[in-house]
Every structure is written in structure tokens, then in C-alpha cells.
A protein has these predicted regions:
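Conserved small/polar residues in nucleotide/adenosyl-binding loops
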Residues: 164-173
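N-terminal lobe of the biotin/lipoate ligase/transferase fold
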Residues: 2-159
């Protein structure tokens, strides 16, 4: 997880101010590194209040902020989404996941994009994937079970999604 994602996660967890010193100690970085990460988050649309002798406080975020740090800071999983690859635009998250699998990626790889230029749906049909309207993703799994059980994976995944604790402001990513 990137330092930006870690800082964002900590700011979300605390409902009060988090001192710059606490962030430095927690992540083993300098005050300058924290300040730069906070600056990047602000540029991405997060409203972070900085008060001298108090620290930083996440006040709000723009509704359309979806990036790798944001998604990583919300994942509360041990292996799903680790690693996470985020792209502003990609041909297809599925194609990228297949390439990563061929190169030995671990089960749980999550490929996420704001836009797909060659997205595919069921039976290889074209999938409209315009930027700014949704988050598109492929979760790569390498299940350790008999192929006869594969059809049950859809049901299991549907149940897992229904129990998830990951919710974003516009319910675009579950």
C-alpha cells in the first residue's frame, strides 16, 4: 500500500485531527514526505484541513475521486486486491489480468480502471466503459478446487459482494 493510501486510511479512521508527528512515526517517514503526500491528496480532490499544533483532518472528498490510493485505503482484505493495479485508461482489465496471470501473479490481483477502450462482456461482446461513469475491474483468482465446482464460484462471489464492507459514496465499487 502506498504512503498516500496509508495516510488516507488513517485520516478516515480517526474522526479527529492526526498530528504530522504521529503520521511520521507511524509510517517511518519525514514531515516533508507527509506534507507532500497530503498535498497530492488535496490536488486529487480531498479536503484536508491542516491546523497548526493539531494536525490534519479529512473533512471531505470530491465525489468523483477514485484512484489507487483511495481504493487501497478502503480495502480491508487479507489477499483480495493485493496487489492492486489501477489505470486511468486501459484496453481491458480482463486482458491485463490474464497477462499478469501468465507472468505468475498471485491470486487476489485486482485490476481496476476508470475507462476501458476494449472492454468485453459475456460471450466476448463489447462493453461500454466510458471514463468518469463507473469503475471497471477484474479480480484474478487461482482457485484450488476441482473444475466441476467452478459454476458455484459465481454464487460464492455474489454472496461475498453482498456482505462486503467496502462502500463508496456513489456505490460504484463493491
Amino acid at each position: 500500500m502506498s504512503m498516500k493510501a496509508k495516510i488516507l486510511e488513517l485520516l478516515r479512521e480517526k474522526e479527529t485531527y492526526v498530528s504530522g508527528q504521529e503520521l511520521c512515526e507511524q509510517f517511518g517517514v519525514s514531515r516533508t514526505a507527509v506534507w507532500k503526500a497530503i498535498g497530492q491528496l488535496k490536488k486529487e480532490g480531498y479536503v484536508i484541513e491542516a491546523v497548526q499544533n493539531k494536525g490534519y483532518h479529512l473533512v471531505d472528498q470530491a465525489e468523483e475521486v477514485y484512484n489507487q490510493a483511495d481504493i487501497q485505503s478502503r480495502l480491508k482484505t487479507k489477499w483480495v486486491g493485493h496487489p492492486l493495479l489501477f489505470f486511468d485508461s486501459i484496453d481491458s482489465t480482463n486482458i491485463r489480468a490474464k497477462l499478469e496471470a501468465e507472468q505468475g501473479a498471485e491470486s487476489g490481483l485486482l485490476v481496476v480502471a476508470d475507462q476501458q477502450t476494449a472492454g468485453r462482456g459475456r460471450r466476448g461482446r463489447g462493453w461500454e466503459s466510458p471514463s468518469g461513469s463507473n469503475i471497471y475491474y477484474t479480480l484474478m483468482l487461482k482457485p484450488d478446487f476441482n473444475a466441476d465446482c467452478a459454476p458455484m464460484l459465481t454464487l460464492v462471489m455474489a454472496l461475498a459482494v453482498s456482505y462486503t464492507h467496502l462502500t463508496l459514496p456513489t456505490s460504484r465499487f463493491v
